[in-house]
Each structure stands twice: as C-alpha cells, then as structure tokens.
Amino acid sequence: MLFVPKKTKYSKSFKGRIKGQTKGGSELAFGSCGLKALEPCRLTSKQIESARRSISRSLRRVGKVWIRVFCHLPVSKKPVDVRMGKGKGSIEMWVCRVQPGRVLFEIGGVSSVLAREALRKASAKLPMRCSYIEDGLR
C-alpha cells in the first residue's frame, strides 16, 4: 500500500527547496505520542510504508497508528544511458517535503514504553533525525 495520489492537476513538478520550520502539523492531533522530524528531508512513499510496517509489527495489532504526512510530489528520472535533452523523464517515485518540527506518525491506545520503542524502530527506517513527543511533553 504505497501512498500516492489518485489524481493530480499536473503530472510533473519542480524539485524545489525545503526552507524554514513547519507552519502547521507540529503538535499532536490524534494520538497520545508521536514522532517529530528534526531535519528537513524528502520522504518517499516507500520509506513511510517501511516505517508504518515497523510500527505495526512492534505494536502487534494493539492501539492505533496515524500517518500525518502524504506523498504528493512526483520525482522524475531519465533512464540510464540516455543523453541529455529530449524532455523531462518519467515519474520514478512520489515524495513529500518534510520541514523540521513536522509530526510524522502518531500512536494512541498503547502504553508509553511500547509506543516509544515502536517509534524508535520506525525512526531507524527514516533518512533524518527524529524525536519522540508525548501529549504532556513538548
């Protein structure tokens, strides 16, 4: 189950840059604890799915997991051994830009110790530094 949009207005996009802190999505909205990004990064749908599977295995079907990011930016790539020019390449993967301070995953309905361990394992699957946050702690 990869996280890609069903329909987009434009098929390809510019690369862009990730500047500044996140404007929204920096606090917990659903669960009692979560995983917050500390560095800017482009997360792929495969990385998000890998982290989600890691959390699900750690929790053993107890509690609930919310994914707070969605991949909506296409990344194009030209094939190997193709010369420059002749248009932009085809879509290789989908990514989302993550700014520092953004909550990536939330967990509810489990103990704090189990949630911390599950999110620690999930953060190992992600290409950036993350921190554990709780409802009372910021």
Curated annotation (Swiss-Prot):
GO terms for cellular component: cytosolic large ribosomal subunit. Gene3D superfamilies: Ribosomal protein L10e/L16. It comes from the Bacteria. Keywords: Ribonucleoprotein, Ribosomal protein, RNA-binding, rRNA-binding, tRNA-binding. Pfam families: Ribosomal_L16 (PF00252). InterPro entries: Ribosomal_uL16, Ribosomal_uL16_bact-type, Ribosomal_uL16_CS, Ribosomal_uL16_dom, Ribosomal_uL16_sf. One of its GO terms (molecular function) is tRNA binding. CDD domains: Ribosomal_L16_L10e. One of its GO terms (biological process) is translation. The keyword RNA-binding applies. The keyword Ribosomal protein applies. Part of the 50S ribosomal subunit. Belongs to the universal ribosomal protein uL16 family. Binds 23S rRNA and is also seen to make contacts with the A and possibly P site tRNAs. PANTHER family: 50S/60S RIBOSOMAL PROTEIN L16, LARGE RIBOSOMAL SUBUNIT PROTEIN UL16M. HAMAP family: Ribosomal_uL16 (MF_01342). This is Large ribosomal subunit protein uL16.
